[in-house]
Amino acid sequence: PSCIMNQSLRAKLYESSIKACKAVNYVGAGTIEYLVDNDMNYYFMEMNTRIQVEHPVTEMVFGLDLIKNQILSHAQIPLPNWMKDIKIRGHAIECRVNAEDPSKSFMPSPGTISSFHMPGGNGIRVDTHAYAGYFVPQFYDSMIAKIIVHAPTRKEAIYRMSGALDECVVEGIKTTIPFLK
């Protein structure tokens, strides 16, 4: 969760988001983004009517399976009213591992991955399609993995992510791992 979020702001954002969805008859998984100023005033930025890349952070903190709920919603199967029972559980952080060279202004780093090891363990999730032998093409989406960590506190989540990044091994191409550390 955002380090500036409090219960009052969360409730206001929730109500505004519900109103926005009802106003356009939107049903399904999605994200509404807001900007918050120094006085805790919030401003609508955009609505994404799709699952976001960052959805694992929400899943870990709220204990929900957003993909499952999206499928149920599109199948017109009523979703449980989980908002009344939802509880925030700790903090989660996501780092995107990209095939880019941070020392060269994040230039693309195509090539064959010769060695590939991602972290694991309690509170660590890795979403990836890459593997040793995978060829990262020149014209591509540079993200090769997402590392998501969950812990009881923000400080512990940062510590867990630091350890997870230290466990990563990607050889044969340059990645953003050194930058993320």
What feature does the model see in each segment?
Residues 1-181:
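ATP-dependent carboxylate activation and anion-phosphoryl transfer catalytic cores
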